[in-house]
Design a protein with these regions (language model features):
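C-terminal catalytic/motor cores of large multi-domain enzyme assemblies
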Residues: 1-274
Length: 274
């Protein structure tokens, strides 16, 4: 399958809100404040850290390992229908605790909120859209060609909202249920995660009784070429466990995604396969 759109698999994770609410309340008693967004991103970071094959991408029918872990998400500058939005990319090395993730997210939201705030991507797009239509089409055709051959300039990759490990959409924040987000053929995004709003559902308590409760559903769209079915299944189970037990995210772990560490793993694998 040469394309990302015809290699897309879909899955959902139903997370009991009482687990999340209990964790948030317990941490609030200690003076630490977390949101569902913090838990979701921290769980994604830890998932990539422990399931490192997920941090790969396919270009030109070849699979590549990433040197970094980058999560992107859209930020509405003002919560109004006609307000502009931007895309923010946050870098991790896989070692982060939920405290580290929360602080990085808070800084990213604060730096990119406000109707008069423009980040580097906004400034670049403003200049790009001033080009004549024919020149813009030519520029984009060159960019797409370079992307297909994995030779796109590093400065453009750094700016691009389509070149990342994972793209997250916080639909809960606009009171919308989860979706299965479409994939982009352009770029390298291998996983889309859409967090929906809470909704009432029947749940089973510790006494094995069916009781009313709340569930939040997370929709995932994945490029199946980066790992096999068993690896994906185990990864999804691990992700669901992290979302149900956020206390697992309180401590840091070893960094996994730097150029040196990725190359070391690659060299070790090549040596083992000789």
């Amino acid at each position: 399958m040469p394309h990302r759109w015809d290699s897309a698999n879909y899955a959902r994770a139903d997370v009991r809100c009482d687990y999340l609410d209990r964790f948030i309340a317990n941490q609030a008693e200690k003076g630490e404040h977390f949101t569902y967004n913090d838990i979701l991103i921290a769980a994604i970071v830890r998932m990539y850290s422990e399931r490192i094959q997920m941090n790969r991408f396919v270009v030109g029918n070849k699979i590549y390992d990433r040197y970094d872990l980058t999560i992107a998400f859209a930020v509405k500058k003002v919560l109004k229908d006609n307000a502009s939005e931007t895309v923010v990319k946050v870098n991790f090395d896989g070692s982060e605790s939920i405290f580290d993730v929360r602080d990085k997210l808070k800084a990213a939201f604060e730096d990119n909120s406000g109707s008069k705030v423009n980040n580097d991507l906004d400034l670049f797009m403003n200049k790009l859209l001033k080009l004549p239509a024919w020149l813009l089409r030519f520029f984009m055709s060159c960019v797409r060609w370079a992307d297909r051959h994995n030779i796109l300039a590093g400065s453009l990759v750094e700016l691009s909202p389509f070149h990342n490990s994972c793209f997250v959409t916080f639909l809960k924040s606009i009171k919308c249920d989860f979706i299965y987000h479409h994939v982009y053929e352009f770029g390298t995004t291998g996983l889309f995660v859409a967090m929906g709003k809470e909704k009432k559902a029947a749940i089973v308590n510790e006494a094995n009784e069916i009781i009313p409760g709340k569930v939040m559903t997370v929709g995932l769209t994945m490029d199946e070429r980066i790992a096999d079915g068993l690896y994906y299944a185990n990864t999804l189970r691990y992700f669901t466990t992290l979302m149900s037990r956020p206390e697992m995210l309180l401590k840091r772990t070893e960094p996994k995604f730097t150029k040196e560490l990725v190359n070391e793993r690659h060299d070790r694998l090549m040596e083992e396969n000789r």
